[in-house]
């Protein structure tokens, strides 16, 4: 099965550029929703013996998705700026993060911390799954750039959703 080419063109040409992301149509996968995209990422990236780091508190269903894959899951406490990169346990293979509007704290990860997270991922060969949850709900300041827009080494998988904007 193939995604609707017109929808993919709109995502590539209009939606993702608003987040600072340039992607070719063949780099875009339309799923049934963000939770389905997180499930797919877990299926592809994790399994027994693999390690994932998630935010604490964070999206409750994510922990269940990762546990079902048999991955070791480390819950990293967030602070007022979101997930602290230096608190991610050594040996993590994948980090799941909501940098633009952390749920449930609503913390927004500052640019310096985003850069530090990307540097840590590069140095330790980690992948990052960015759940761009609720980015458009930033009413006090312009939306922060997507983590994927800062990624120069291909370590970030961006998960976006239309559910809050439709």
Model-derived features with residue positions:
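Conserved core of the PLP fold type I
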Residues: 1-124, 136-157
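PLP-dependent aminotransferase class I/II
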Residues: 157-166
């Amino acid at each position: 099965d193939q995604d609707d080419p017109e929808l993919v063109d709109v995502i590539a040409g209009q939606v993702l550029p608003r987040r600072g992301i340039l992607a070719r149509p063949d780099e875009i996968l339309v799923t049934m929703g963000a939770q389905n995209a997180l499930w797919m990422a877990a299926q592809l990236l994790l399994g027994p013996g693999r390690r994932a780091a998630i935010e604490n508190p964070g999206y409750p269903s994510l922990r269940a998705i990762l546990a079902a894959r048999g991955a070791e899951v480390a819950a990293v406490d967030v602070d007022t700026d979101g997930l602290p990169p230096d608190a991610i346990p050594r040996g993590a293979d994948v980090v799941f993060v909501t940098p633009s509007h952390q749920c449930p704290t609503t913390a927004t990860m500052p640019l310096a911390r985003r850069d530090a997270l990307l540097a840590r991922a590069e140095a330790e060969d980690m992948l990052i799954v960015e759940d761009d949850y609720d980015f458009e709900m930033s009413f006090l300041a312009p939306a922060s750039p997507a983590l994927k827009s800062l990624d120069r080494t291909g370590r970030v998988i961006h998960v976006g959703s239309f559910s809050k904007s439709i």
